[in-house]
């Protein structure tokens, strides 16, 4: 008997142990990401050829305690390597695990390599050569918790590579993951009609057809790890291969299971057909190009097993939620008696099906953790948490309170916005506590920002509510789902407001009181324009004529644009970010503003203020400053807290202000308290102007910011 380890993705252990038991392996023991077992050589060959779940089979040669480099060397040296491969063979070592005396895997691999070549030399043979690529023999070593396991890769390249895939689709599903979906769904135990309406490159259907037609998944592989092993029994292997070929030929002829696959992408359907042809099962599968929402169930009952799109890219979530909701509705109405098994990485999406799962499992698609849910669709399946919607009822009724509120807000604000001369404004700001989101309109696009929920509310509840919001929005305010972008906003910490989210850009040009600004709805947490400061920017513009204007913590320079359009004598725009200064320059160009009177300065604003306060000639007539609530950026010398530091900050700013000048000071700290007493002693006059700077669309949230007009006393 030989000792083996079958490696597999996390979550496969139970299924793999069951498969090995069915093969006849013994001493089966589940471990992390794999299963140990023993088997005679012939059975090991059969398992390697027929396993549908394992990623790799390794022959365990040594396993024992290891507490020093010397012990590691001795463990490898004591193995009679010449019994496993010739010195004419090349070899490589994959070492996994660190800890204790092993600081890095390269050190461990080097020790084992030295032991192997020394053993060959001491036995009177020439040393074998190491090959980093395509070695004849691959040694796998694992060090964990003071135990070293040394093994030989018995199966060769990853067993999920069956050999039938020509190229992959955009998001390929690994073959052994598809096989595990078929096993855990219950389909493999009783093969029946199978439908995949998001078939992509056909992996689920092809794996199912291979099972139903009794075709060994490794039959088309061109290489196995044991081929250069000295104990390889070519005759036994040939016999097992020929038996598998005969079973495959007979199995295809006898298979009476019906398979149906469709995808909206004709290129993927063509690819699926090529893959099925390569696998020898094309005649068993009916492929067609179709929208999943238009696919009709085949006659009778069966299984629908699929891996639908779950869009990892920001901004596609609303459209996908609509798709999942419509799928759930279709399943309920048209697939009575069927079983559905669905793999998805996003709990919000899969919950949008509004179906009660019989079973929920975890699987990993590569490093991506996914939910694998099983559903039984009874003739009168009901939606979870929601009454069945009668014909003609709007989808918004799944969140009626939210839908009614935002519909009312939108109706009121649309006329106001047109009159104001703006096309970007806030529609909803957590008006109903259960729906803790902000919804902003930017022309014909919508941005939904989720606020961080209190810790007392279960995550599943917040996700369901967010899902309902995104489902209700299109019907409630008449917006296309693909024009809804979703973002998650937490309480501001340091420079969170500048966190980059996505390389993809969705850029628009918005108009505000005659000024034009570039927006990026997807690249950053904020879009490039703080809508709550709309009136503050207009106020800056109104106060700027003939004045020298300074804009600090300028972000994308929108206040600077208003100042320039308002007739400022000069405008100095200061921000630490080159990205935002470049954006500010674009905003100036959009408004046909150019000239030496417009200066852009990249600097740590606090340090720039300190330095400028020492320069008596640095005088400004109007200063606008909107500092972060808190910042500890690595590029800033010190941390900044607006409550703690505002007196010191204003004390420096007043030195930059001309005798009749004004400072417009704003911040977003909700419980900010201006230290008027200390400032008065410094001969600084302070006036709160919140009433002048709170726009109508923010009246529901009067603490969104606080604004002050500051002058010399």
Curated annotation (Swiss-Prot):
Organism superkingdom: Bacteria
Catalyzed reactions per annotation: guanosine(2445) in 23S rRNA + S-adenosyl-L-methionine = N(2)-methylguanosine(2445) in 23S rRNA + S-adenosyl-L-homocysteine + H(+); guanosine(2069) in 23S rRNA + S-adenosyl-L-methionine = N(2)-methylguanosine(2069) in 23S rRNA + S-adenosyl-L-homocysteine + H(+)
GO molecular function, one term: 23S rRNA (guanine(2445)-N(2))-methyltransferase activity
Entry GO terms, CC: cytoplasm
UniProtKB keywords: Cytoplasm, Methyltransferase, RNA-binding, rRNA processing, S-adenosyl-L-methionine, Transferase
Compartments in which it is found: Cytoplasm
Top-rank EC class of the record's enzyme: transferase
The EC number(s) this enzyme carries: 2.1.1.173, 2.1.1.264
Annotated THUMP domain residues: 43-154
CDD domains per record: AdoMet_MTases, THUMP_AdoMetMT
InterPro entries for this protein: 23SrRNA_methyltr_KL, RlmKL-like_Mtase, RlmKL-like_Mtase_CS, RlmL_1st, SAM-dep_methyl-trfase, SAM-dependent_MTases_sf, THUMP_dom
Annotated function: Specifically methylates the guanine in position 2445 (m2G2445) and the guanine in position 2069 (m7G2069) of 23S rRNA.
UniProt cross-references to PANTHER family, sorted A to Z: RIBOSOMAL RNA LARGE SUBUNIT METHYLTRANSFERASE K/L, RIBOSOMAL RNA LARGE SUBUNIT METHYLTRANSFERASE K_L
HAMAP family, A to Z: 23SrRNA_methyltr_KL
Family: Belongs to the methyltransferase superfamily. RlmKL family.
Protein name: Ribosomal RNA large subunit methyltransferase K/L
UniProt source species: Shewanella sp. (strain MR-7)
Upper classification of the organism: Bacteria, Pseudomonadati, Pseudomonadota, Gammaproteobacteria, Alteromonadales
């Amino acid at each position: 008997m030989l000792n083996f380890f079958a490696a597999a993705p996390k979550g496969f252990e139970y299924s793999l142990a069951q498969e090995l038991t069915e093969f006849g392996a013994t001493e089966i023991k589940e471990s992390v990401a794999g299963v140990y077992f023993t088997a005679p050589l012939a059975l090991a060959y059969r398992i390697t050829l027929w396993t549908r779940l394992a990623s790799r089979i390794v022959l365990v040669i040594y396993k024992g305690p290891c507490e020093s480099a010397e012990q590691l060397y001795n463990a490898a040296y004591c193995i009679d390597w010449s019994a496993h491969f010739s010195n004419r063979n090349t070899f490589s070592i994959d070492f996994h695990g660190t800890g204790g005396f092993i600081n890095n895997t390269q050190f461990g691999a080097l020790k084992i390599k030295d032991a192997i070549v020394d053993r060959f030399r001491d036995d009177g043979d020439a040393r074998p050569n190491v090959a980093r690529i395509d070695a004849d023999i691959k040694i796998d070593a694992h060090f964990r918790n003071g135990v070293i396991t040394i093994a030989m890769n018995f199966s060769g390249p990853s067993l999920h590579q069956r050999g039938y895939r020509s190229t992959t689709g955009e998001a390929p599903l690994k073959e052994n993951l598809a096989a595990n979906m078929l096993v855990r769904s219950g389909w493999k135990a009783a093969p029946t009609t199978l439908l995949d309406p998001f078939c992509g490159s056909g992996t689920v259907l092809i794996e199912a057809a291979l099972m139903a037609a009794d075709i060994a998944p490794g039959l088309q592989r061109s290489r196995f790890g044991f081929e250069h092993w000295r104990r390889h029994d070519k005759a036994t292997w040939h016999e097992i291969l020929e038996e598998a070929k005969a079973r495959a030929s007979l199995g295809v002829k006898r298979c009476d299971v019906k398979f149906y696959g469709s995808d909206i992408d004709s290129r993927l359907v063509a690819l699926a057909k090529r893959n099925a042809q390569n696998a020898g099962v094309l005649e068993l599968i009916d492929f067609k190009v179709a929208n999943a929402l238009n696919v009709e169930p085949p006659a009778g009952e069966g299984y629908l097993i699929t891996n639908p799109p779950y869009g990892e890219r920001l901004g596609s979530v609303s459209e996908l939620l609509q798709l999942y909701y419509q799928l759930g509705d279709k399943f309920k109405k048209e697939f009575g008696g069927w079983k559905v098994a669905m793999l998805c990485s996003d709990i919000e999406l899969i919950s949008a099906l509004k179906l009660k799962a019989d079973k929920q499992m975890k699987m990993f698609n590569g490093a991506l953790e996914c939910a694998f849910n099983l559903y039984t669709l009874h003739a009168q399946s009901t939606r979870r948490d929601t009454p069945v919607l009668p014909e003609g009822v709007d989808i918004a009724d799944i969140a009626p309170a939210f839908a009614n509120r935002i519909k009312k807000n939108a109706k009121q604000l649309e006329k106001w916005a047109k009159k104001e001369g703006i096309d970007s404004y806030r529609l909803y700001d957590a008006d109903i506590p259960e729906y803790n989101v902000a919804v902003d309109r930017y022309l014909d696009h919508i941005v939904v920002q989720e606020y961080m929920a209190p810790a007392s509310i279960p995550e599943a509840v917040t996700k369901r509510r967010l899902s309902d919001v995104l489902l209700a929005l299109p019907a409630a305010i008449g917006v296309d789902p693909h024009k809804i972008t979703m973002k998650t906003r937490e309480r501001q910490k340091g420079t969170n407001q500048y966190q980059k989210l996505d390389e993809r850009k969705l850029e628009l040009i918005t108009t505000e009181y005659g000024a034009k600004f570039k927006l990026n709805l997807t690249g950053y947490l904020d879009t490039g324009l703080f809508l709550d400061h709309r009136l503050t920017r207009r106020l800056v513009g109104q106060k700027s004529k003939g004045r020298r204007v300074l804009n600090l913590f300028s972000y994308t320079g929108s206040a600077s644009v208003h100042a320039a359009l308002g007739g400022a004598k000069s405008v100095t725009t200061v921000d630490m970010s080159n990205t935002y200064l470049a954006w500010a320059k674009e905003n100036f160009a959009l408004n046909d503003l150019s000239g030496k009177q417009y200066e852009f300065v990249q600097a740590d604003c606090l340090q720039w203020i300190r330095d400028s306060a020492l320069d008596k000639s640095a005088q400004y007539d109007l200063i606008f400053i909107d500092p972060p609530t808190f910042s500890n950026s690595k590029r800033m010398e010190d941390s900044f807290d607006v409550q703690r530091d505002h007196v010191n900050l204003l004390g420096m700013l007043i030195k930059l202000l001309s005798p009749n000048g004004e400072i417009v000071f704003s911040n977003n700290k909700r419980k900010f308290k201006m230290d008027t007493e200390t400032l008065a002693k410094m001969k600084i006059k302070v006036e709160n102007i919140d009433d002048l700077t709170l726009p109508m669309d923010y009246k529901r949230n009067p603490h969104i910011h606080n604004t002050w007009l500051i002058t010399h006393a």
